[in-house]
UniProtKB/Swiss-Prot annotation:
One Gene Ontology term, aspect cellular component: peroxisome
Broad class of enzyme this protein falls into: transferase
Keyword Protein transport tagged: no
Key words, A-Z: FAD, Flavoprotein, Lipid biosynthesis, Lipid metabolism, Peroxisome, Transferase
GO molecular function annotation: alkylglycerone-phosphate synthase activity; FAD binding
Name of this protein: Alkyldihydroxyacetonephosphate synthase
Family statement drawn from the similarity comment of this UniProt entry: Belongs to the FAD-binding oxidoreductase/transferase type 4 family.
UniProt-annotated location(s): Peroxisome
Important for enzyme activity: annotated segments: 534-536
Organism of this sequence: Trypanosoma brucei brucei
Length: 613
C-alpha cells in the first residue's frame, strides 16, 4: 500500500505547485533548455513559447519568477478564527494528531491548483485560509466532526487531493466570523469490501487514484477512471466535481461508476441503496457533482472492471481538426467506441510535439522530409494538421475488431497512421500538463484551462467562436497569447471541448485579462449550448452562471435541497450555489448581496475583495 495512505499527504506534496516536492520541469541555464521530470530535454518548448505564445522576433530568453518561500508565505497567513468550545469538544472525540491548528497545515489547505490559485499563493495573496485542518480516520469520525460543526455553527470544507481547478476547496472569504475547518480525507483510503462476482467494490473516498487500482489489482480488477489528476486526486474529489477520465468512452464518467454512497450531512447520514439500477428518484445523482455543499461523502460503492488483456494506443494525423472531428463523429454514429479518442486542433498539436521529449517522434514531425511529404504527397497545409490519439483496451479479439473498423473510417478521411509510438508517449506523459503550467508560472508566463460539453451540432462552431473570443480579448489588451483545444469524452449526442491557453505575464493586471478570457469564453460556450464545465466542477468559478444554466426554478430547487440538508449553510458555502436568501430579505436585496459575495470576480484582483467585505 502506498505510504501516503498511512502518513499525511499534504506534508509530502508542494504547497505552491503540482505534485511531490522536488518533482518539476527544471531549466538548464547553461544549455537554455527545459528539462522534463523524466530528465530528458524539451528541445522545442522554448521555440514554441517564443513563436506561438509571445510571437516575438530575435533573441528570446525566459526569466525565472520565484515566488515566496514557505516561511514567507506562512507570515502572510491571517490569524485564525478559533471557536474554542468546538475545538475542546473535538479533542474529546478525536486524537491529537487528527486536529491540526499549525500554520503549515493551514497554508496547504487554502487553494486548489489552477493558475489563479498558484499565482496568489506564490505571492502571498492569502485572503481566507482555513482555521484548522481535521483528518478523519473513518466514517464515524466524519459523523462526529459534522455533528459538532452543526452544533457550533462551524463551516466545513471537504478537501481530497486539493487538485481542484475551479476554487472548490478555498474557504469563502466572506466567512469572517465563523470558524472554517478543512476536512482532509486522505487518511480514509481503504477498500472495505469487494464483490468480484457482481463487479463492485466499497472504498473510503479519501483513497487516491493509484491506491484504488493497486488494491483492486490484487483481485485482477481496476476502476477505469483515469483523470489528468489521477496520481493526486481522490475518489471523493471525483464524485464531488462530477469527474471524467481519459478512458471514459469505454468505462464511463464517474456518475456511471458510482452505485451507492454514504453521505454525512448536518441533519444526519444519508445512505443510498445498493442495487443493479435505482428506482424512483436517484439519490446518487443528487450528490454526484455537489462539491460538499450538501454534506461529506465518506464511502462509495463503485463498479470495477477486469484488467484488460490487451492495451493498444496509437497516433494518427489528419489534414485538419475539422476533418478529424468528422471522422470521429462518423465512428461514434457507427458505434465504434475506442477506449480513448483525443483530437488535438492545429495549435494543440504543435504544443503536443513541442512539449515532447521523444526525440525521434519530434524530429520526424519537424524534419524537412516529413514536411515535404505532408505538403507534396498528401497535399496538406502543415499549419493545419491535427494529431489524434486513440486507445483500445479489452480482449485481443475485441481490440482487433474495433481497430479494424476505426482504421476503415480514418483512412476514408485520408488520415495517416503514425503507429504506436505517439500513443505510448501520450500514455507515459498524460499527467504532465500541470508541470508544464507550473514551469510557465515560474518563468513569467501564465497558463490555465477551461472546458465544456457541447452537442455535435454546435461543437465546431463553439470551438471556432471560443478561439475567436480569446484572440479578441488579447487584441483589446495589446497582448499576444496562445490557445489550443482538444476534444475527448465522446458521447452519443456530443463531446467535451477542452481549451488550454498561455500568455506572457507582466504584472498583477494580467489576472484581470485572465478573468476577461474566462467571462468571454463562458458567454460564447453558453450561446452554443455548452455547459459550464465538463468535469472540473462548479467551485466558485462558475457560480455566476448557475442561474442562467439551470433556470430560476431549477436553481431554486437545488437551493431548497441544500437548505433541507444544511439549514445553517455550513457545508462549503460560496461553492456550487450563490449565497442563500436571509430571512426577511427582499429578492432584490438577496440578489445584491449574492453579487457582492460572488468570489469569481474578486479573488486575486487587488482591492476587489476588501471593497465588498
Amino acid at each position: 500500500m502506498d505510504k501516503r495512505m498511512i502518513t499525511d499527504a499534504f506534508e509530502e506534496i508542494k504547497w505552491n505547485g503540482w505534485g511531490d516536492t522536488g518533482v518539476c520541469i527544471k531549466y538548464d541555464e547553461a544549455r537554455q533548455l527545459p528539462i522534463h521530470t523524466n530528465g530528458k530535454p524539451m528541445k522545442h518548448l522554448l521555440k514554441f513559447m517564443k513563436d506561438d505564445v509571445l510571437k516575438v522576433k530575435g533573441e528570446f530568453k525566459i526569466k525565472p519568477t520565484p515566488g515566496l518561500t514557505k516561511e514567507e508565505a506562512i507570515k502572510r497567513l491571517p490569524p485564525p478564527v478559533v471557536k474554542q468550545p468546538f475545538v475542546d469538544e473535538l479533542r474529546q472525540v478525536l486524537s491529537k494528531d487528527q486536529i491540526r491548528l499549525d500554520a503549515y497545515a493551514r497554508l496547504t489547505h487554502i487553494f486548489g491548483k489552477n493558475y489563479r490559485d498558484l499565482w496568489r499563493v506564490r505571492r502571498g495573496m492569502i485572503d481566507r485560509p482555513p482555521d484548522a485542518v481535521i483528518l478523519p480516520n473513518n466514517h464515524d469520525d466524519c459523523v462526529k466532526i459534522m455533528e459538532l460543526a452543526q452544533k457550533h455553527n462551524v463551516v466545513v470544507v471537504p478537501f481530497g487531493g486539493g487538485t481542484n481547478v475551479t476554487g472548490g476547496v478555498e474557504p469563502n472569504p466572506f466567512e469572517t466570523r465563523r470558524m472554517v475547518i478543512s476536512i482532509d480525507m486522505r487518511r480514509m483510503g481503504r477498500m472495505l469490501h469487494i464483490d468480484t462476482e457482481s463487479g463492485t467494490a466499497v472504498f473510503e473516498v479519501g483513497v487516491l487514484g493509484p491506491d484504488i487500482d493497486e488494491q483492486l489489482s490484487r483481485y485482477g480488477f481496476m476502476m477505469g477512471h483515469d483523470p489528468d489528476s489521477y496520481a493526486y486526486s481522490t475518489l471523493g474529489g471525483w464524485i464531488a466535481a462530477r469527474g471524467s477520465g481519459a478512458m471514459s468512452n469505454k468505462y464511463g464518467d464517474i456518475e456511471n461508476m458510482i452505485l451507492a454512497m454514504r453521505v454525512v450531512t448536518p441533519v444526519g447520514v444519508v445512505e443510498t441503496p445498493l442495487t443493479s439500477r435505482p428506482c424512483g428518484v436517484d439519490l446518487n445523482a443528487m450528490f454526484v457533482g455537489s462539491e460538499g455543499a450538501f454534506g461529506l461523502v465518506t464511502e462509495a460503492v463503485v463498479k470495477i472492471e477486469r484488467l484488460p488483456e490487451v492495451k493498444r494506443y496509437e497516433g494518427w494525423l489528419f489534414p485538419s481538426f475539422e476533418v478529424a472531428f468528422t471522422a470521429f463523429h462518423t465512428c461514434t454514429r457507427k458505434g465504434i467506441h475506442p477506449c480513448t479518442m483525443r483530437l488535438y486542433d492545429e495549435d494543440d498539436t504543435r504544443l503536443s510535439f513541442a512539449a515532447s521529449t521523444d526525440s525521434g517522434l519530434v524530429s520526424t514531425f519537424f524534419s524537412k522530409c516529413f514536411k515535404k511529404y505532408i505538403a507534396t504527397v498528401k497535399g496538406w497545409n502543415l499549419s493545419k494538421i491535427s494529431l489524434v490519439v486513440v486507445g483500445f483496451e479489452g480482449t485481443k479479439a475485441q481490440t482487433n475488431c474495433q481497430r479494424s473498423e476505426l482504421v476503415g473510417v480514418f483512412q476514408a478521411f485520408g488520415a495517416t497512421c503514425l503507429g504506436t509510438k505517439p500513443g505510448n508517449t501520450w500514455q507515459e506523459k498524460k499527467y504532465d500538463l500541470p508541470y508544464l503550467r507550473d514551469f510557465a508560472l515560474a518563468h513569467n508566463f501564465w497558463a490555465d484551462v477551461f472546458e465544456t460539453s457541447v452537442l455535435y451540432t454546435d461543437a465546431i462552431h463553439c470551438w471556432r467562436a471560443v478561439k475567436k473570443s480569446f484572440a479578441e480579448v488579447m487584441a483589446e489588451n495589446g497582448k499576444n497569447a496562445w490557445i489550443g483545444c482538444h476534444t475527448a469524452h465522446q458521447y452519443r449526442f456530443g463531446c467535451c471541448l477542452y481549451f488550454t491557453f498561455i500568455g506572457g505575464q507582466a504584472d498583477e493586471n494580467d489576472l484581470k485579462i485572465f478573468l476577461q478570457v474566462k467571462k468571454r469564453a463562458m458567454e460564447v460556450m453558453l450561446q452554443h449550448r455548452g455547459n459550464l464545465t465538463h468535469h472540473h466542477g462548479i467551485g466558485y468559478e462558475h457560480v455566476p452562471w448557475m442561474k442562467r444554466y439551470n433556470g430560476e426554478g431549477g436553481l431554486d430547487a437545488i437551493m431548497k435541497f441544500k437548505k433541507a440538508l444544511d439549514p445553517k449553510n455550513i457545508c462549503n458555502p460560496g461553492k456550487l450555489l450563490p449565497s442563500p436568501p436571509s430571512e426577511k430579505e427582499t429578492p432584490k436585496a438577496t440578489q445584491a448581496r449574492q453579487n457582492r459575495e460572488m468570489m469569481f470576480d474578486k479573488m486575486g484582483i487587488p482591492g476587489a475583495l476588501q471593497a465588498h467585505l
